[in-house]
Design a protein with these regions (language model features):
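Pyridoxal 5′-phosphate
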Residues: 1, 7-8, 36-41
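Acidic active-site catalytic centers that drive phospho-/nucleotidyl reactions
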Residues: 7-9, 23, 75
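Short hydrophobic/aromatic-rich motifs at helix boundaries and adjacent loops
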Residues: 1-4, 87-89
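Generic N-terminal amphipathic, Lys/Arg-enriched alpha-helix
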Residues: 7-17
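Hydrophobic aliphatic residue packing
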Residues: 14, 26-27, 76-77
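A non-catalytic alpha/beta surface segment that caps or lines the substrate-entry region
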Residues: 19-66, 86-93
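Active-site metal-coordination/substrate-binding segment of hydrolases
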Residues: 67-102
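Short glycine-centered, acidic/aromatic-flanked micro-motifs in structured strand/loop junctions
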Residues: 18, 45-46, 72, 101
């Protein structure tokens, strides 16, 4: 299996201005990344009468247990006043051993 650099992946994800409800391409990016790692992927759209449709990425690796489930989200709330940030929220930066970004 291909190795992944978690810090670089986090930086790549932060670069997407995926402000709710726009995903800015981050879901497609992550789907391609996971597919290259051997995951079977599928985008599922959930919708009902009271909410706008929401896309979800479902990814599975293998078919035997034990199983591990990760549930997260790819969108963020607006960053607010950019003058309040010490860095551009969508240009990740490592400072003093900490990754800073939105």
């Amino acid at each position: 299996m291909q190795k992944i650099n978690e810090l670089e992946l986090a930086k790549e994800l932060i670069r997407f201005p995926s402000i709710t409800p726009i995903d800015a391409g981050v879901m497609s990016f992550l789907e391609k990344k996971l597919t290259k790692l051997g995951f079977k992927t599928k985008i599922i759209t959930f919708k009902d009468k009271t909410h706008k449709p929401v896309k979800n990425l479902y990814a599975r690796l293998g078919n035997k247990g034990p199983n591990f489930c990760y549930a997260g989200h790819l969108d963020v709330v607006p960053p607010g006043n950019l003058n309040d940030w010490t860095v551009n929220p969508f240009k990740p930066k490592v400072k003093n051993g900490h990754l800073i970004g939105r």
